[in-house]
Amino acid sequence: IDALDFATAENEPDALLDVAVLDGVLIFLGTESVEFWGATGDPDLPYAPIQQRVFEQGVIATGCVVVVDNSFVWIGADGITYRNGEVPVAISDDGIVERSKASASHRLWLLEDERHKFLCQRHDGNTMLYDVTTGEWSERQSYGRSNWRAGPGLGDDETGTIWELDGYVDAGGVF
């Protein structure tokens, strides 16, 4: 790969925090915007920005976007949880937004349990779950804690060790 082959956000050049892929479209989530890039068919420039397809609401932190049911959900920089459509649609209520704004850390992951998909949104002192099927929010806690101990994880195919999913380390070593 040529070191000069790179691309940057073009419609709204802001700091990139997260990336998702939905139906072959790359979704770049920055601090202030969400930008969509589609396949071009050109081997020298396989993806390019989709013109007029930008959301003017960025993501709050890395690890705060999930692809679910032919859409994606992210925690916006304003603390509101959004689901995409032609325009972003807020799915969080005022209570969820207040918890998000008051938190210094944020995490979003998907959990499937008994035919229900839940978006798990962790803040400093609480974990809120959004049932994708019913559209209802609930709170989960572990015994003796204000927060739920569960989190996103991966299993090692050789040792069976469970790792916490993190974008910066691999079993304690840097990627």
Residue map of PLM features:
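Beta-sheet-dominated scaffold domains
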Residues: 12-174
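A short, charged helix-loop
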Residues: 1-9
